[in-house]
Amino acid sequence: MDNGTTVISMLENDLYKFSMSYYYQRTTPEGIGTFSFTDRNGQKFTQEFVDLLKSEFRKLSTLALTEEEFRWCHDNIYFIPQCYFEWLMGFRFNPDIIQISLDDEGHLHIEATDLIYKVTLYEIPILSTVSEVYYRTYEKTEPDWAFIDSQLEKKVALSNENKLKFANFGMRRRYSHEVEDHVTEYLTRHAKYFIGSSTVYFAMKYQSIRPDLKPIGTMAHELMMATAAFMGPKEANYYVMRHWAEIYGGNMGTMLPDCFTTRVFLRNFSLDMAKLYDGVRHDSGDPFEFGDKIIAKYESYHIDPMTKSIVFSDALDFDRALAIQKYFEGRIKVSFGIGTNLTNDVGTVKPLNIVMKLKTFQVNPRQHVYRCVKLSDTPGKELGDPDEVHSYKVILGLI
């Protein structure tokens, strides 16, 4: 780790950020997006903290994709064409587009605006930097490495004993780069059913130990949010499914259903898409109810659910994951994306509850700027202007 820098590689980002960036290049190359930070716990910060953040964000501009990383991406992220990684070699983060401020009560506000295929790459580095700088500044405690290893030993034992397949989804709210590195190495060496990491850098780093280790991920809510902003929410899910399939040809075939509620998604989940996609990801609401609905949908199309999969990724720990696996055993294939419980279970602090979501989208500079909305299967996880949220619910027949 270089002088406490929070992010040390252009590939220290979630895989789906690169896949979505290329999707935007293909579908809305002139689209302009604004991502906005939300602290769900309403933490209060100081100007000193803001100044430290600005210093860290300036360091992002020094990152560049190396020749070695380019070759690895070409060989391992084969579903994104070489031309994208050639573009990425020339891409640099621009700290000037990251606007940071405190309101009168000390709440933190961060926004970033640019062409959407560029600005989507900012979200995860910003979140992980806020998290790491927070622990350095306010907690000023070192991770309890003995505690971390003790927790990992229990989690790995549970996974190995129950053949529980999981990936690390934990960069955004991690304690630090150092902790995620340590956790990933431990899992790589000891967890038989650890299948990979959403953080591309660590998948690359530890593939030398485990050649089967993979970068993991598909898409995020922002795709449906951006699409709905310019064409309305009724068919946004189907539009994304169709265009994603055209671009990736069946690769990265896990759909995210809950952006406008799973109830709405199931209306859009046509027979052809149900057959084409490998499965879906659960990210809000009751996981057992969700899985039952997905299985019922497949069965209504006479598709054997055991040929499909669900990736569960909503605030999981290993005990919860095991309960889900047992419930769906023999009914549908399952795997798990576990984040904060891996990368911020350090024995000394509580994880922050922070997100950064698409606030507005403009399909090109000549068009209107639309406000974006995310609904959810969990009450209270909705994001967007309250009037716009209400409008979406009316349009979608949810109220």
What are these language model-derived features?
Residues 1-236, 240, 245-246, 357-399:
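Ordered alpha/beta subdomains of enzyme catalytic regions
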Residues 2, 206-399:
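Glycine-rich phosphate/ribose-binding loops and adjacent secondary-structure elements
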